[in-house]
């Protein structure tokens, strides 16, 4: 006999999807130490833990756009183990290693850049870091050979790394074009970490499928994105203290992060307004490497709500739009016959409570009910 679950006192939704989650660390407070001091095996354990915790929070599918701490393919082993039922956890779509250049946002040896000998040792561990068209063509082929679902590139600098900035292009045009052409020849989509509008526009012209962050967006670029059917995963959470300016909280950040948030705050605020008002295809992703634990995906809902995005657009992004970005729209993203029974329920008011997605009351993945956990930081 079928089990009856009474959810009449909750709001029922499809299982949520986080389209930008780096799964390979235990605690955001110690992420830099984990980069350098934990083994690939330990990082794979972190991925398992993250997958279990995200499922318990109502996010039945997550997208991993490259390892922050890891250099290997543990995320693919975890993905396959979940699919085979050996372990429980959110469904994973993964690009195990992002492609990047020396000194770029993806070059985690920057932390040792004042000790070149040690920095070079760490740099050489990141096998998807290199230079030249031929290197990156082969890197794309290797990622696909080992099981990557899509390709991720670090096209510009970022906020969290010490010796680059969001306005820098960090691969040359030939490298960028070669990556996209090769991935498309092999039937894979490409997404890029990118901030500045000139680089967004260049990537669009080269044939990019999607872009992450895009936080310095302008209206001209937004229209190009629409015209070329490119998706954007804007990841609001990492920039909240700058967008909703909070100088006290900014002062608690690490030095290089703090300096960039202050420097770019006006541009981040302007970009947020463009993103909020544009008609681009927006996905829901968190990228919480410096603000909250990676599995607390509900914080992005709070960020969207407090930016005036509206509940329906936010939930649409976290379900149907994300299912399309992950190329799983025939299986997840809506509740309808023929799709997986991925279901979540929420007792807080999704229309008015910005913390609603941090307090999951029920979760089912592929017809199996799992225990839920609410956000560790919620007090009520």
What do the PLM-derived regions correspond to, one by one?
Residues 77, 131-232, 248-249, 261-282, ...:
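Histidine/acidic residue-rich metal-binding segments in metalloenzymes
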Residues 23-43, 102-124, 158-172, 228-267:
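Active-site gating loops and adjacent loop-to-helix segments of metal-dependent hydrolytic enzymes
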Residues 22-27, 68-73, 100-101, 109-110, ...:
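Active-site environment of divalent metal-dependent phosphoester hydrolases
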Residues 28, 75, 104-106, 161-163, ...:
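Histidine/acidic-residue-rich catalytic or RNA/ligand-binding cores of hydrolases
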Residues 1-13, 376:
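Histidine-rich, glycine-flanked metal-binding segment
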Residues 10-84, 102-106, 174, 203-206:
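Metal-associated gating/positioning segment near the N- to mid-region
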Residues 48-74, 88-98, 148-161, 189, ...:
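Divalent metal-dependent hydrolysis catalytic cores, especially in the metallo-beta-lactamase
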Residues 35, 185, 189, 252-256, ...:
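His/Asp/Glu-enriched, well-ordered alpha-helical/loop segment
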């Amino acid at each position: 006999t079928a089990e009856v679950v009474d959810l009449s006192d909750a709001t029922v939704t499809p299982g949520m999807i986080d389209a930008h989650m780096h799964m390979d660390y235990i605690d955001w407070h110690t992420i830099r130490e984990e980069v350098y001091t934990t083994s690939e095996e330990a990082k794979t354990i972190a991925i398992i833990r993250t997958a279990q915790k995200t499922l318990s929070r109502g996010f039945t599918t997550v997208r991993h756009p490259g390892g922050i701490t890891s250099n290997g393919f543990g995320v693919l082993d975890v993905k396959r183990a979940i699919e085979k039922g050996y372990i429980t956890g959110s469904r994973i779509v993964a690009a195990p290693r992002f492609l990047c250049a020396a000194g770029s946002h993806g070059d985690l040896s920057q932390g040792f850049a004042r000790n070149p000998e040690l920095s070079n040792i760490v740099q050489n561990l990141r096998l998807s870091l290199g230079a030249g068209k031929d290197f990156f063509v082969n890197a794309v082929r290797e990622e696909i050979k080992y099981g990557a679902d899509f390709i991720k590139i670090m096209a510009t600098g970022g906020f969290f790394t010490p010796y680059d900035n969001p306005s820098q292009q960090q691969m040359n045009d030939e490298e960028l074009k070669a990556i996209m052409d090769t991935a498309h020849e092999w039937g894979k989509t490409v997404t890029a970490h990118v901030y500045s509008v000139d680089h967004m526009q260049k990537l669009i012209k080269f044939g990019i499928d999607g872009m992450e962050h895009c936080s310095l967006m302008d209206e001209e670029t937004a229209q190009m994105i629409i015209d070329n059917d490119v998706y954007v995963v804007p990841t609001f959470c990492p920039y909240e203290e700058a967008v909703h300016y909070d100088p006290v909280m900014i002062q608690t950040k690490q030095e290089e992060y703090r300096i960039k948030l202050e420097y770019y705050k006006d541009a981040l605020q302007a970009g947020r307004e463009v993103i909020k008002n544009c008609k681009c295809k927006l996905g829901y992703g968190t990228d919480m490497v410096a603000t909250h634990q990676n599995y607390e995906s509900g914080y992005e809902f709070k960020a969207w709500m407090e930016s005036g995005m509206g509940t329906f657009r936010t939930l649409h992004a976290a379900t149907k739009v994300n299912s399309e970005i992950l190329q799983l729209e025939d299986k997840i993203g809506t509740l309808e016959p023929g799709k997986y029974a991925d279901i979540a329920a929420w007792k807080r008011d999704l229309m008015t409570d910005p913390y609603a997605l941090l307090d999951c009351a029920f979760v089912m993945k592929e017809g199996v009910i799992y225990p839920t956990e609410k956000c560790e930081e919620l007090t009520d």
